[in-house]
Amino acid sequence: MAVVSLSEMMEAGAHFGHQTRRWNPKMSKYIYCARNGVHIIDLVKTALCMNNAYKWTRNAAKSGKRFLFVGTKKQASDVVAQEATRCGAAYVNQRWLGGMLTNWTTMKARIERLKDLERMESSGSIAMRPKKEAAVLRRELERLQKYLGGLKGMRRLPDVVVLVDQRRESNAVLEARKLDISLVSMLDTNCDPDLCEVPIPCNDDAVRSVQLILGRLADAINEGRKGSNAERKN
């Protein structure tokens, strides 16, 4: 049985690519046709890729791999946070800060700073400071929560990055590839399938399309982790 049906993808608008002038020729094998100057993605091939992505992701989770979801565009931000949280993955959904992976030591220190500030806030320590100092600390806390809040549970570098919009998140792609971190990527018609291990050709701009694909990948991670836990109990 298919992980995602053709009708589900059609309803989500997963078949709509970009304008034909904004395409990457490497995506030609995933394109069905062009209509009114817009490329239409071959959803039969998307379904096959999605089956492969589900199995690959499930097996990675079963073997204990750690996941990071990345998607900072407005229409993906909430979905990224929601689905990553649902499957216990870390996430970046506001802005990719340079060095999030390649300068992990510094980034980890910033995450620890965030945790310290949260403890200070919850204990009332910040409220006891002079008004101006408290305001500075709260601004710092707010900024760190915005950009690093999704990474608080990430103690080590991830093994897999799940990506929405390869072009927008090009810095994340470069850092992951530099560190040999696997990439599972939603690929619109302007993307490069050679830059990821697990391609999923689909519309990466429509909220419903992003929700559908990330939702299934989160399901795969949860299923894989349940299998891993069951094996340990036995």
Curated annotation (Swiss-Prot):
> Do you know which InterPro entries this protein is assigned to?
Ribosomal_uS2 (IPR001865), Ribosomal_uS2_bac/mit/plastid (IPR005706), Ribosomal_uS2_CS (IPR018130), Ribosomal_uS2_flav_dom_sf (IPR023591)
Q: Which GO terms describe its molecular function?
A: structural constituent of ribosome
CDD domains from the UniProt entry? RPS2
Annotated disulfide bonds: none
Q: Which UniProt keywords apply?
A: Ribonucleoprotein, Ribosomal protein
Q: According to its record, what are the GO cellular component terms?
A: cytosolic small ribosomal subunit
Q: Does the keyword DNA repair apply?
A: no
Q: Which domain of life is it from?
A: Bacteria
| Gene Ontology biological process | translation
User: What family classification does the UniProt entry report for this protein?
Assistant: Belongs to the universal ribosomal protein uS2 family.
Q: What is this protein called?
A: Small ribosomal subunit protein uS2
**Could you tell me the gene encoding this protein?**
rpsB
